[in-house]
Amino acid sequence: MDFRVKSGRLEKQRSACIVAGVFESRQFSFIAEQLDKISKGYISALLRSGELEGQVGQVLLLYHVPYIMSKRVLLIGCGKKRELDERKYKKIIINTVNALNNTGSIEAMCFLTELQVQGKNTYWKIRQAVEIAHNLCYTFDKFKKTKKISYQLRRITFNITNRRELTSSKCALQHGIAIAAGIKAAKDLANMPPNICNSAYLASKAHELANSNKHINASVLGKQQMKELGMNAYLAVGQGSANESLMSIIEYQGHLDSKARPIVLVGKGLTFDSGGISIKPSNKMNEMKYDMCGAATVYGVMRVVLSLNLPLNIIGVLAGCENMVDSCSFRPGDVLTTLSGQTVEVLNTDAEGRLVLCDTLTYIERFNPEIVIDIATLTGACVIALGHHFTGMMSNHNPLSNELSSAAEQAGDYIWPLPLSNEFHEELDSHCADMTNVGGSAGGAITAGCFLSRFTSKYHWAHLDIAGTAWNTEKHQGATGRPVAMLSQFLINRSISDNK
């Protein structure tokens, strides 16, 4: 879909459809009031007959409104004017895009950016509208013989009433389009079936990205290299699979100083997780193809970074692996020596993601990172704690935690901080090794974060548990692309602060 911004007088706008807001009690927004004046009261007469009350998300499509140059006018209910917040605005945009897709309009002129949303500016309103519109038009039908009929809507133009906001509005378009494309890339990768998307497939996507841009280099560590390095925890997880474990490294150099310390993003890439010997229940095991959503997120973010040419040095790691049941599988009771030299007693082979990540987090020390963020569908406990709306976050550095929280608020892609206190570390005590790979049943998301923190003492680090936010299980099944938007916003913020 194409998006544009412009500033012009309403009466001169020619479009297949004009979109304007109406508040509760049939109170016009500024643009709706202008439309009513141009139509000589035609719209207000319709509303007085009860056609639209103005409740949030209500829509009324009008055809051939007198003296209006556009064929259609779409009025959208915006609720009470003083209570218009982020949540309601998103609902308004969702209902608007859905209605436009049903009108048969190829393009539309949207005036909803004039709405005053609590605490939000025009940049935010446009960017959110772009991301939402892209998301609503997303389909994954790669493996369907009969494809869905594509939406007719091809272009949305946002009309800006204040010309001084044109520059920031164009920036919002640029960011929104890039992030939406990154979200789509992450969703496409995560939605791939596990018989196709294995570690080698992730590696091919890394090389594909490198071949597309001179600022990107890709390299892959295979089983033999990891064995020589001593990445025994990582390798143990994949030793029951016929698919080789591969760690793909995507290096982007955008900083003017090539020696500037990089930001490293680590994505858990379990392309399928059976649970291993501690096998998962068969119900919904098919969803365990989504256990690589962390790697898909990193891939999507790297696509955004490339699109925006961010002036940063960034390394993305796709920690590819598959946890399967076999006579060669690792077992409960095994003791593994990690790359860091610390030993881990395996109590549960379904707590495998942290074993892959712990060696990866040690490996990336060689890059002398400024910041490390790992993204992982790590624990069901995080879903119990935070549901499907918030990503769990733990960090060993409060300023980093605050930066991520701020980026999440800006992007509307929310996270919630969890503690990393010593009391939880005691849950990992082992009688025969330095630690166990699981704690007790209580606070499982936190003990998993505590486990990872033991491998991150040499840099500032944050852990994002996306088990509850990475994919939908019921309505609109499939990957969500979260938290691509939040991480992209974090990197945009960083690029601004680092280059002042």
UniProtKB/Swiss-Prot annotation:
What's a BP term from Gene Ontology annotated to this protein?
proteolysis
Q: Could you tell me which Gene3D superfamilies the record lists for this protein?
A: Leucine Aminopeptidase, subunit E, domain 1 (3.40.220.10), Zn peptidases (3.40.630.10)
- As recorded in UniProt, its EC number(s) are 3.4.11.1, 3.4.11.10
Which stretches are transmembrane? none
* GO terms for MF: manganese ion binding; metalloaminopeptidase activity
Function as written in the Swiss-Prot or TrEMBL entry: Presumably involved in the processing and regular turnover of intracellular proteins. Catalyzes the removal of unsubstituted N-terminal amino acids from various peptides.
What name does UniProt use for this protein?
A: Probable cytosol aminopeptidase
Q: Which organism is it from?
A: Baumannia cicadellinicola subsp. Homalodisca coagulata
What taxonomic classification does the UniProt entry list for its organism? Bacteria, Pseudomonadati, Pseudomonadota, Gammaproteobacteria, Candidatus Palibaumannia
